[in-house]
Amino acid sequence: MKTLVQRDDGIAIVRLETPEDGEVWRAAFVGAYQSIWAEPPYDERFFPDEAEGVLRRALRVQDNVTLLAVRDSGLCVGFGIAYPVAAKADVAREIRGLLPPERTCYFAELGVLDGWRDRGLGSQLVQQRLACVDTEKYRYVLLRTSASKNAGYEMYRKMGFEDTGVYMEVSARRMDGSTRTDRRLFLSMAL
């Protein structure tokens, strides 16, 4: 585990490099993951084992970039996860013909707890992931965000991501227990 940034507000952005690093922060990550995705516009319900699986799977993928924004108290207030798009088969299928999957890094997860938003933390997690991507292997970054073009969309656009015009329907369990689909929009950036 390596500290990439120590912010003035007491938050450190750390890079998890091994499954053992993930074990140290597992419980804190699970709590943050469940809380963040339970909020609009996603309103998704994840059980603890599902959230834990996100972290474990990411750390097993070669060339992953797994970042947590943490406090000394052990609280995880945000996260950013990236890995080769080839590790996410459904996404790789959607973008074939748009970007070369073997040269594309997928920014799979970005989340910041509600009380820690509007402090530049989301942008900083994106910037740190961009800095960690191996540009010898990957020429493009791809992500998907809510098609509602909310604050997250605007943040990515200001950072230079381009709207691809490609959408994907994502099915998920909602907070009310139902399963529904919503539309996600792909954004990309050349490195």
Over which residues does each language-model region extend?
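Conserved N-terminal entry element of GNAT/NAT acetyltransferase domains
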Residues: 1-27, 31, 35
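Conserved acetyl-CoA-binding loop-helix of GNAT-fold acetyltransferases
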Residues: 112, 118-133, 154-158
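Conserved GNAT-family N-acetyltransferase fold
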Residues: 67, 78-80, 105, 110, ...
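Conserved beta-strand-loop-alpha-helix junction that forms the acyl-donor binding cleft
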Residues: 117, 129, 142-153, 169-174
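Conserved acetyl-CoA-binding loop of GNAT-fold acetyltransferases
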Residues: 157-166
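Short hydrophobic/aromatic beta-strand or adjacent loop that forms the aromatic wall/cage
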Residues: 64, 181-187
